[in-house]
Amino acid sequence: MKPIDLQAENSTETVGRSLRRRPLARKKLSDMVEEELEQMIRRQEFAQGEQLPSERELMEFFNVGRPSVREALAALKRKGLVQINNGERARVSMPSADTIIGELSGMAKDFLTQPGGITHFEQLRLFFESSLVRYAAEFATDEQVESLSKALEINSQSLSDNALFIRSDVDFHRVLAEIPGNPIFMAIHVALLDWLIAARPKVSDAELYEHNNVSYRQHIAIVDAIRRHDPDEADRALQSHLNSVSATWHAFGQGSKKKK
């Protein structure tokens, strides 16, 4: 390492002021272990799918305690660089779209509990799926349209069972998200619906039944527009559907508050 040439600085006073502005922070042992392991993985000293050394071996190699090793491995897992299963050594992996979106899950659920949080996420879903249906109407293949039709048929068969209908509803929108063939879109779609469904109030089966029938009819309109390759009509049908879903669940939420 090249020594610092103090003459190259304006003065030692400048250096002093600079250090006062940016105090040095001491790194935790676990952070240093994490950084070194990350570099080893990126240099491919450990190949994808290969197991890392055991915790004890890592402790000896880095001369640190077990907590530091475990914290480092947990941090690498959050980055998607390793997978950790109970009773097994950590295995090298590569970040996926699910890993990236999964990191946001806790923050997203906290945000949903804030005033206006659900509305903001519903708007995000509307903007996102609006683009999906327009793309589907323009570019969906016959096979992809057939997949939508099959999802619609399962939707119809599930109308009398609320739990099954919710599952078939999610699957219908998942097929839409699959059409562009982008794994990031799929990860966003799955996460968005998981977050929004988890934030919904509990509603009786009788109240949900009519809502299910309305949603099903709206799904038909979306598929019909996609089959005709009409992106404007597909977008209108999708927006009508999601605005209706939002209004219904907001009404359910207000009703559950009054009952309390």
Swiss-Prot record:
Protein name: HTH-type transcriptional repressor NanR
Protein's job: Transcriptional repressor that controls expression of the genes required for the catabolism of sialic acids.
Any one of the GO BP annotations: negative regulation of DNA-templated transcription
HTH gntR-type domain mapped to chain residues: 27-95
Gene: nanR
Pfam families, sorted: FCD, GntR
SMART domains: FCD, HTH_GNTR
PROSITE patterns on file: HTH_GNTR
One Gene Ontology term of the molecular function aspect: DNA binding
Keywords, in A-Z order: DNA-binding, Repressor, Transcription, Transcription regulation
Coiled coil: none
Positions of the DNA-binding region: 55-74
Family: Belongs to the NanR family.
InterPro entries: GntR_C, TF_FadR/GntR_C, Tscrpt_reg_HTH_GntR, Tscrpt_reg_NanR, WH-like_DNA-bd_sf, WH_DNA-bd_sf
